[in-house]
Design a protein with these regions (language model features):
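Conserved nucleotide-sugar donor-binding catalytic segment
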Residues: 138-210
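Short beta-strand/loop segment that forms part of the nucleotide-sugar
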Residues: 31-39, 59-60
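Short aromatic/hydrophobic "clamp" motif used to bind/position activated sugar donors
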Residues: 83
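A conserved acidic beta->alpha catalytic loop
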Residues: 37-46, 63, 118
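Conserved donor NDP-sugar-binding/catalytic core segment of glycosyltransferases
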Residues: 97-126
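Short, well-formed alpha-helical segments that are part of the catalytic scaffolds
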Residues: 12-25
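Glycine-rich, basic loop-to-helix element that forms the pyrophosphate-binding segment
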Residues: 61-78
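Acidic helix N-cap motif at the loop->helix transition within catalytic regions
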Residues: 15-17, 42-50, 95
Length: 236
């Protein structure tokens, strides 16, 4: 069972080395780490290239396309049987890949979402991301408020035939899209209350977690629902 890890990077030099080390130490010789760099202006690319590891496939964008499009590009390059998504600034616990590989081997499941420990500026603040965000497997719940956290997701490659291409529209995020599409097409989705990564919150990403205005949320949800409708009924 071949594993592909998909990652999008942008100015991630502060944390990227630790994250890549935590991933590569768990991958087999035939596994791969696909990284799409979205025109970083720091030394992120240099850090990645310094690993000199044949399992790393680095794709450098010539123009900035945004995180969703970058992740979509990494998924198109993935050839593993199981695909794991990764942020650039977390750290994987040392049993993550073996846990995921074994879980897919012995269970009839298409997509899993596992739990995470949370640190903020290096200090442990929570033992459960699930508890923090109120994670749930329900379809309508996730359309309203997303529980599909990309850095905690792994899924079978066959899901991609329904997932790709991911619409590049306001309010549509790659992880929510993958999870909700999987539910709509009746793939088996399981949430597992086992933390397998350390999810790192810091000043560079805390701003993206602020509560948004209802005047922003409503049009974003409409965009998502319309995109889901077009995919399911028109195949677009």
């Amino acid at each position: 069972m071949k594993i592909t890890v998909c990652m999008a990077t942008y100015n991630g030099s502060r944390f990227i080395k630790i994250q890549i080390q935590s991933i590569l130490s768990q991958l087999g010789k035939k596994d791969q780490l696909v990284i799409v760099d979205d025109c970083s202006v720091d030394n992120t690319v240099e850090i990645i290239e310094n690993f000199k590891d044949s399992r790393i496939i680095l794709i450098r964008n010539t123009s900035n396309i945004g995180a969703v499009a970058a992740f979509s590009k990494s998924l198109k390059a993935a050839n593993g049987d199981i695909i794991l998504l990764s942020d650039q600034d977390d750290e994987w616990l040392d049993n993550k890949v073996s846990f995921v590989r074994n879980f897919f081997t012995i269970n009839n499941v298409d997509l899993i979402v596992h739990d995470a420990k949370i640190t903020q500026n290096g200090n442990l603040v929570s033992h459960s991301l699930f508890t923090e965000i109120g994670s749930s497997n329900g379809l309508l719940k996730n359309i309203y408020s997303n529980s599909f956290t990309g850095c905690c997701m792994a899924f079978k490659r066959n899901i991609l035939k329904n997932v790709l291409p991911i619409p590049i529209k306001s309010g549509i995020f790659h992880d929510a899209w993958i999870g909700i599409i999987s539910k709509l097409y009746r793939f088996k989705v399981i949430f597992i209350a086992t933390p397998l990564i350390i999810h790192n919150r810091h000043e560079d990403n805390l701003s993206t977690m602020k509560r948004r205005s209802i005047f922003k949320i409503i049009p974003d949800r409409i965009n998502l629902i319309l995109a889901l409708f077009h995919r399911v009924f028109n195949g677009k």
